[in-house]
């Protein structure tokens, strides 16, 4: 994705005229769905029980036992190399301390490993991008679905900013709101108005947006719970709430131009009791190979067992932060005293550097893709890179991970960016990758348009099917058959073959989100570039209902029981009720 593209505004589409009659959007949708084969359809809707182990020492994988493990070659000055996967050449890496000094042999004091995504947090809600370390969520709880309709429950006006040649209204990619049902001790400690502090059902919306403000709202009503935190410079990505229920927010700055005023890049740490920033990581970093750009679009993961935050950056570094956090609810105080190390790396095709997607974690193994198309795996404990493969183009979409009896796999897709700029193939590649080896299992290609301002291809994170959908993974592909159009398709996890493919009249950068209902069924939500939110049946891809959010909605929604929250280019945050 281009780092400072002109943002295109889409006209509102509240109603259309079809056959001389004014009809609702849903009634005259021109989207078409083409069904395919479904040979691996599950016979049961049950999801196997997951391990609840959270001890990093027990979860950690012995790196030398991994299939195809190759010992690193020592190159001197703390630099190490390993061979690329399925192509010639080597990649290298180095680890730096917070004073930009090379660490010759990084030997951390403790192991860092994540458990099953159900163990990422005990706090109800959606606390990071797609909810957990596998990035397979985005929805919490179950919705009581009766009418299969959507209804706007509340709206919160928000602002905009402009930069040189760019316009940023409302919220955009990835822009997922955070929804958190605070523990009582945290709720009481934050200095909220009594009607929220004393309400056991209170759930808060925490939403960093383009205008450089963090909004805090009541999920039920949209009412402000505290004044917005204003850092002056815009957020593009998604923040993270501390998974222990501590009143700490972590969020990266995606824009440094506020109406002509240029500011510093920072990854920001917020104390939600004081309602202010208390620490930050500068984006322009001497250890980086990309010295001119310092944005942070990634949504951090926090390992609550070891008090460790991990955040990839657009400067090409990966930051590992020992938070040294303390929370005293009785004293109404929270503090951090961070210590950090930084991972720098490059592969044979590295030129641009920078990571815009959010890291995925399986035990002590972590995964990301970068602007040069490098998909790689590193160890969260030692920060050594274990394997790397090149996907052929920029990958901004966060991948999703699944552990199965057959292995551990990643689902990922790239966009048409670098190849389009150099006259190369204008194809988006969707892949299934073996997470332990980096080997490709299958690939599905879709032609997509190139535009340096608005990329085509995969920008949204795929939705991984579970239960009755466990044979499919759903991808959203932008700008396929025409510059304004797109496709959403369900692929068979085993083969990569199409289960269904839905042509979308208006393309989407938003991530499709699956939620559970009390009736035992699953439903899907996706938004598009004309501001339409679609409630669809993930079994078939067909719409059940739609509603207009005014303008382009490229942010990804979050869902808490019957409430959906997302903001659009119409400069509003919406609370939408599932009826």
Where are these regions (language model features)?
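Bacterial N-terminal signal peptides that target proteins for export
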Residues: 3-15
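Hydrophobic helical h-region of N-terminal Sec-dependent signal peptides
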Residues: 16-22
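C-terminal motif of bacterial Sec signal peptides marking the signal peptidase cleavage site
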Residues: 24-27
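Bacterial lipoprotein signal-peptidase II cleavage site
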Residues: 29-37
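Post-signal peptide N-terminal segment of mature Sec-exported envelope proteins
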Residues: 36-61
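Extracytoplasmic/lumenal domain signature
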Residues: 53-112, 136-173, 178-251, 255-296, ...
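Predominantly extracellular/luminal regions of secreted and cell-surface proteins
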Residues: 117-142
């Amino acid at each position: 994705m281009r780092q400072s593209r002109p943002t295109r505004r889409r006209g509102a589409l509240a109603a259309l005229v079809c056959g001389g009659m004014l009809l609702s959007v849903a009634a005259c949708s021109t989207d078409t769905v083409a069904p395919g084969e479904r040979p691996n359809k599950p016979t049961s809707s049950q999801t196997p029980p997951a391990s609840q182990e959270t001890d990093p020492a027990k979860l950690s994988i012995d790196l030398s036992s991994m299939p195809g493990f190759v010992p690193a070659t020592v190159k001197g000055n703390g630099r190490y190399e390993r061979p690329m996967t399925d192509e010639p050449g080597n990649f290298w890496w180095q680890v730096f301390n917070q004073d930009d000094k090379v660490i010759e042999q990084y030997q951390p004091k403790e192991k860092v490993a994540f458990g099953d995504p159900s163990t990422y947090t005990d706090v109800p809600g959606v606390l990071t991008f797609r909810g957990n370390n596998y990035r397979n969520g985005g929805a919490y709880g179950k919705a009581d679905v009766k009418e299969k309709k959507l209804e706007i429950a509340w709206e919160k006006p928000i602002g905009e900013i402009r930069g040189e040649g760019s316009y940023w209204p409302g919220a955009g990619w990835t822009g997922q709101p955070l929804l958190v049902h605070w523990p009582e001790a945290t709720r009481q400690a934050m200095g909220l108005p009594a009607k929220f502090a004393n309400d056991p059902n209170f759930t808060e919306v925490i939403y960093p947006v383009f205008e450089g403000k963090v909004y805090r709202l009541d999920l039920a009503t949209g009412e402000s719970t505290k004044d917005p935190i204003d850092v002056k410079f815009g957020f593009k990505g998604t923040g993270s709430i501390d998974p222990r229920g501590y009143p700490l927010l972590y969020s990266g700055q995606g824009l440094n131009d506020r109406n002509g005023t240029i500011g510093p890049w920072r990854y920001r740490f917020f104390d939600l009791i004081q309602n202010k920033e208390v620490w930050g990581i500068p984006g322009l970093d001497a250890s980086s190979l990309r010295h001119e750009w310092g944005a942070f679009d990634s949504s951090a993961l926090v390992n609550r067992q070891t008090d460790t935050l991990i955040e990839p950056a657009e400067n090409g570094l990966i930051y590992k932060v020992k938070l040294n956090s303390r929370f005293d609810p009785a004293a109404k105080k929270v503090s951090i005293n961070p210590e950090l190390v930084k991972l720098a790396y490059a592969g044979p095709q590295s030129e641009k550097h920078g990571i815009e997607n959010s890291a995925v974690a399986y035990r002590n193994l972590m995964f990301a893709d970068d602007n040069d198309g490098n998909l790689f795996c590193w160890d969260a404990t030692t920060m050594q890179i274990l394997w790397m493969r090149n996907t052929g183009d920029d990958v901004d979409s966060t991948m999703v991970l699944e552990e199965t009896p057959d292995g551990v796999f990643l689902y990922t897709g790239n966009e048409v960016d670098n190849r389009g700029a150099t006259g190369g193939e204008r194809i988006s590649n969707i892949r299934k990758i073996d997470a332990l080896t980096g080997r490709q299992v299958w690939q599905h290609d879709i032609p997509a348009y190139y535009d340096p301002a608005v990329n085509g291809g995969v920008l949204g994170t795929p939705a991984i099917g579970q239960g009755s959908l466990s044979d499919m993974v759903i991808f959203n592909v932008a700008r396929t058959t025409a510059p304004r159009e797109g496709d959403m398709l369900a692929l068979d996890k085993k083969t990569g073959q199409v289960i269904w493919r839905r042509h979308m009249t208006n393309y989407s950068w938003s991530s499709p989100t699956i939620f559970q209902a009390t009736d035992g069924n699953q439903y899907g939500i996706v938004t598009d570039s004309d501001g339409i939110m679609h409630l669809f049946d993930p079994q078939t891809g067909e719409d059940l209902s739609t509603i207009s959010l005014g303008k382009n909605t490229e942010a990804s929604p979050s869902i808490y029981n019957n409430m959906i929250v997302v903001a659009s280019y119409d400069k509003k945050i919406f609370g939408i009720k599932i009826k």
